[in-house]
């Protein structure tokens, strides 16, 4: 077994963390934002580095980054963690009690409060045991002195007013057996009764934080035993005035089987202390108390999914909301999700560049203080120039997260997006600013995105000066996709895949590709399609999903940019109320989309148009009765008037092709119906209701049944962020129940 131990104040040194800040630029930037100054500059500033309000945040950050580096390089997770004073916050961070930012906020406040303490002093008495030091204090009526630290069996730190410490130091220097009395360079009486005011203010501050269940036992400085979840806040707050019982903490860990220790952070102060303790003291063999409720609360909404994924995307939850065409996944939806620690993708399909740019600027303004979001880009096989323009726009505005949908292969535009800004970090790792989450459902497509970019594309982009030679070189060492989203049967474009088959296959493919190309960073695999209930989300995580992506359920929320009439229809649907219909944007190929069918004629009429397209070479070949039905029932206008609208919509080049090819002309006329059916639905035109094209999967039907009889039964009470949090919380609860039941039967 192994314990990771984290040092506290006194271990700081000038230049610490220099090899870490470049390796973790996003966390370093977060630290700078929280602290209001550069953490890297602080660690170079010897004067500030020795001031409590700066020392503690600096050590916390360096310890935390050291831990991440250690786990990433070795894959090693400790069996226990402990930290000396300030270092205990890193032990709790490693155990998952809070994330990096929350821990830094706590440490910043702690350092500020402790730095206010004036007139105090501390001294280390070396050569006497805790009992002997206590006897000397009592015999000499030094009752204003507290024991602050028990660092080793014979290194005891005392704390109190400066004049009392001076008096006590003189007494101890005359005591037989004392090897040295070392006065510490501090201004406060830390870990003593004199920190009560700081403790009380910190107690009020910590109240607003929600600590997650510990995934690794953490040894408390105060009790020298593992933290109990229900007493976490009280124990951590009590550390400010309580003694740091480091000796018994290590003795307790020594009592576990074959325990080894590794110090994580700057210096080797704790390593030296542990060597003294193991040489001078016996192990404590108390049994570890496991709280009865621990099994019931081991999994939380925030602990679901891959931790590195959440850290990379700066998320609290491993929960994404996929892009929906024509901006149905609206800017309002994206902002709502970001504010709650989730991520949504603005849907650009069917929108012009100006509309998308306005949305990006609006979202960036709303999230100027933080929050992650992305842009969904749908592949357009016929108009790759529009894809290039979209990538230009995303790069122009510094968009980092792209959800790639309906791509059957890797395109130059995607490669260019991924390549821009690539650089090699100080530790040799490749730092990718732009991230692509490839949404796919076929292994051959996954293989393309899990491979480095094709060399011919890189050479062409470099020759055209669209990427640099260095960017092209680095692209040969990383996959095109930062992460993969495996899309099972879903609303909209779908291959009708089955998650139980797809997820294991793609995960194994990912593992094979990781070995083949020896990538330095794992590609995470997420799950989408059919996720609308806790049971479905649980199944996704149990299949190995690092994150989940919802879609259909978000279309029936207040934030969805579609009509109330559509939401009324969606609210009433059940799992059987969908059908497959031809996709308007891929009409000629026969690709399918899944749509709502209950009370609508669109699925039938769309299929009829595609059947006619397949059977006839031109619209003139269609018999008069059928053509009249199309004009009166489908188009509610003559074919000639529809073609006039088509000519106004498409480019001269497209119309020229249509004039030369009657079948192409027929396709453009029929595709007008698909565009109009979507536009009418979004607008909420009651006269065109039966022709509404509403992309949707069975997940929403399952969701409707789940929330039936609750306040969420009405879409007017459904908000994308609230749905996301509720789904994750209920999934965590369900997992705990199922695991508990499973363990009881074993």
From Swiss-Prot:
Pathway(s) annotated for this protein in UniProt: Antibiotic biosynthesis; bacillaene biosynthesis
EC class of the enzyme, as a word: transferase
NCBIfam families, sorted: fabD, pfaD_fam
UniProt keyword Cytoplasm, yes or no: yes
Record's protein name: Polyketide biosynthesis protein BaeE
Annotated source species: Bacillus velezensis (strain DSM 23117 / BGSC 10A6 / LMG 26770 / FZB42) (Bacillus amyloliquefaciens subsp. plantarum)
RNA-binding as UniProt keyword: no
Domain of life: Bacteria
Span list, region Acyl transferase: 1-312
Cell compartments where the protein resides: Cytoplasm
Chief localization: cytoplasm
GO MF annotation, one: [acyl-carrier-protein] S-malonyltransferase activity
Residues of the active site: 85, 191
The enzyme's E.C. designation: 2.3.1.39
Organism placement in taxonomy: Bacteria, Bacillati, Bacillota, Bacilli, Bacillales
Function: Probably involved in some intermediate steps for the synthesis of the antibiotic polyketide bacillaene which is involved in secondary metabolism. Probably has an acyl transferase activity and could also have a flavin mononucleotide-dependent oxidoreductase activity.
Cellular component GO terms, alphabetical: cytosol
Family assignment from sequence similarity: In the N-terminal section; belongs to the FabD family.
UniProt entry keywords in alphabetical sequence: Acyltransferase, Antibiotic biosynthesis, Cytoplasm, Transferase
Entries under InterPro entries matching the protein: Ac_transferase_dom_sf (IPR001227), Acyl_transferase_dom (IPR014043), Acyl_Trfase/lysoPLipase (IPR016035), Aldolase_TIM (IPR013785), FabD-like_helical_ins (IPR049489), Mal-CoA-ACP_Trans/PKS_FabD (IPR050858), Malonyl_CoA-ACP_transAc_FabD (IPR004410), Malonyl_transacylase_ACP-bd (IPR016036)
GO biological process, one term: fatty acid biosynthetic process
Catalytic activity: holo-[ACP] + malonyl-CoA = malonyl-[ACP] + CoA
